[in-house]
């Protein structure tokens, strides 16, 4: 073999070696930086201090709330995952016999994975009412033969609802469903699903193979515009479709207004919904007086026909809370069991003659204040402070350590139009939908 031939062979061998070592099958790019996650799920009651909960279902979501992976805790209540790409994630946890975490209306729990580090977290679950006789339902959500990840799965029976989301492999489990018959369906942008009627739930048993297979493409469309009034900050604003009964967000059904404050939302599935503007924390809320002047923003979709097909909103400035106030990263603040709530004046409600106070629990029930069990537009507030007062100490039933609550503050203005406002006032602002959530130390 000649010298030149040998050099060519060596050169080619070197190229192959460099190519194999550099590409790693990824077209020349190196592997992304990774970290690890170690999560422990424990019983939050004093009767079982830090007892690990076995077989809890932990759904890991990305920063956009899309499922990444689903885990089941071991006998010690632990799940571990190495080699996770670094970044921001969220967690949703559920288990038979326990309330889910986070509860409804509370954003998923945020966690951050850092390069070369193990992020650890201990999350408490609290038992459900021991008088309840419950089972579970499981299945998969599919479109044809493909799994559908991130679909909202809802079971309804005897006026009670149960929700979860499908995992990355399309699987779902609805825990703690009261014994009896329920109807089960799923929602996600762009797909319609049938309802599984009268699914039988038996105590201490999982009713399996309740698969939800898409029946077709969803193509409903709704549009409208936003008008900013009374201190509302003009900005791109979210418009969100939620389930009318559970008030859970329909996955994929959130859009933002354009430069002219218009929006168009497409892919609406069949069902009965509510459409909300400025649901996210952005300093604005829907003018609460709209419920009086326009009615609730309800939407019904039937095979692509949306009624109504247009809906516009007036947006005002929200009542701004100081304690508690949920920061932008959605880390829920912790308060003592006897907190003092504070807020401050803004132009959108500077003319308020008073403020109504409401503290709700994880089930959405008022534990202090509120409107006598009625809608804020129709009821009479039971805990109030006068205009110009921006603080009130909590004086309701004992708040439970480890549990979540939400403070709602409604700005009221006297109005003598008793036809529209039979209680002598109208609402001119309110705290944001996702603000005011706190956990008791």
Task: Identify what each model region corresponds to.
Residues 1-9:
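Bacterial N-terminal signal peptides that target proteins for export
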Residues 9, 18-441:
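Long luminal/extracellular ectodomains of secretory-pathway precursor proteins
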